[in-house]
Amino acid sequence: MAFSATQIRRGMVLVFEGDPCRVIEFRHHTPGNLRAMVQAKLKNLRTGSNFEHRFRAADTIVKADMETHELEFMYQGGDTYHFMNSENYDQLELDDEALGDSAPWMQPGLKILAEYYNGRPIGIQLPNSLVFEIVETAPVVRGATKTASSKPAKLENGVTVNVPEFVEQGTRVRVNPSTGEYLDRAKD
């Protein structure tokens, strides 16, 4: 589907020089007496590289024909992560490079959305929050609820996040995997 460059929006996936690229940021502006343009920061989903490109307002952009499938993470074997398609039970293997920053957040049974372009998986979307147990953190200090300070805590997946002072070791917490921020204590 083709559209004008002025219709570019954040999160949109378009075809640029034959590769699918996600729009990370964009800015529409008209400098002085020049023609309108759209400055966009793009991420190439095939190579993983980020770059900027300036589109003229009259440029025609092609939206990438993407498919999305729900996958369930089964297990990790070395650098390979094994998934099962929840719709047709097909098995799929992705490596560390394909998962990128999402790799440490994988836990058995986790359901993710995989994006496919031309029948090949090119990216995944994690849920907005995941639950992990804190395996290491400083002990609770009396009166810690009076101040809004935080302390580092190591999760069971090895990732370190900042948590409020009142959170102790063994507590299950919800974390936003895209930002690595503590959300709240899990209500199990």
Curated annotation (Swiss-Prot):
Top-rank taxon: Bacteria
Keywords on record: Cytoplasm, Elongation factor, Protein biosynthesis
Keyword ATP-binding: no
Cell compartment(s), UniProt: Cytoplasm
Pathway(s) this gene product operates in, as recorded in its UniProt entry: Protein biosynthesis; polypeptide chain elongation
Function noted in UniProt: Involved in peptide bond synthesis. Stimulates efficient translation and peptide-bond synthesis on native or reconstituted 70S ribosomes in vitro. Probably functions indirectly by altering the affinity of the ribosome for aminoacyl-tRNA, thus increasing their reactivity as acceptors for peptidyl transferase.
Listed name of the protein: Elongation factor P
